[in-house]
Amino acid sequence: MKQTEKIEIEIGQKLNSYVLSLMESDGKLLIAHEKLGYSYFGQLSTVDIGKYQEEAGLKDYDGMRRGDYIKGYISQIRRFHFHDTGRRSPFTADSHIVNDAYRMYEHGENLAAILYRIQREKPMAYRRIIRVIQSVAPYFSDFYFQPTEADMVRLQWQDKYSSMIYGPTDLSDGTIRFIALTVLFMQPWLPRVIIIDEPELGLHPVAIEKLSGLIKMAAQKGTQVIVATQSAELISNFEPEDVLTVNQNEDGTTINRLNSEELAHWLEDYTLGDLWKQNIMKGGQPR
């Protein structure tokens, strides 16, 4: 199997860019080259901020405002993973209504605090979240918040047919995941970049369709959403250019973006997911 000698990462945002080259040295990952890019009178210019070092120099670089811009951009990249839904899952954790309410955590452990803040500060957004949840779980009525004297709150809810108060473990795995995904993509304080792994796990087909709409809505608001998925149903709700396939062989890993023109004839009768399952579109198949 061929080994990659160098990995290069480039982040571009309007007139600013950040490039990081990684290489192996004595069994360790080493930063071979690090630089900032900017536009100067219409010409692309770069400045080196680090070479052959173990840690990135961007966080300590104060040489230009663009460095602060890129640092701010990178700091708003968030990754999420809502797979754990057991009796001791992150969704069962208590969270502080102030300290834990600034941004959603990676595994959803502060979901209650985020929802409580949205309810108090953005009631219209909160009501929209409730309606989307009800479109998948019609029995769901509302969340129930009862902060303690220590300003801690836990995720609780009510259904339409009972006065009982339920917890997250009283929801199916797919429903609690869908609730977390709904809050993630409908929150008023969206991060610039959301990275999420297999959000379709355990979701009803109707919920998968709703999820695709939530992803598109967040993207329309300026958030870049990067999703790793194995769901043919999910990608069927997107355009070919929205989908990148990742393939690995003896020459390494390649990433290819699908092309509408190449698939136009097939898409007249089949969905994008159908083409994936039938191995008609390029890539994305186990080898």
PLM-predicted stretches and their roles:
Residues 124-127, 131-186, 196-209:
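Conserved ABC ATPase signature
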Residues 210-287:
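C-terminal lobe/lid and adjacent interdomain/linker elements of RecA-like ASCE P-loop ATPase modules
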Residues 13-15, 24, 161, 189, ...:
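A generic beta-sheet turn/junction motif
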Residues 8-135, 141-144:
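Electropositive, glycine-dotted interaction segments
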Residues 34-36, 178-184, 228-231:
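Phosphate-binding glycine-rich loops of NTP-binding sites
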Residues 192-193:
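The start of beta-strands in P-loop NTPase/AAA+ ATPase cores
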Residues 5, 15-16, 75-76, 239-242, ...:
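Short glycine-/polar-rich loops that comprise or flank the Walker A/P-loop
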Residues 6, 150-154, 250-252:
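A generic structural signal for beta-strand entry/edge sites
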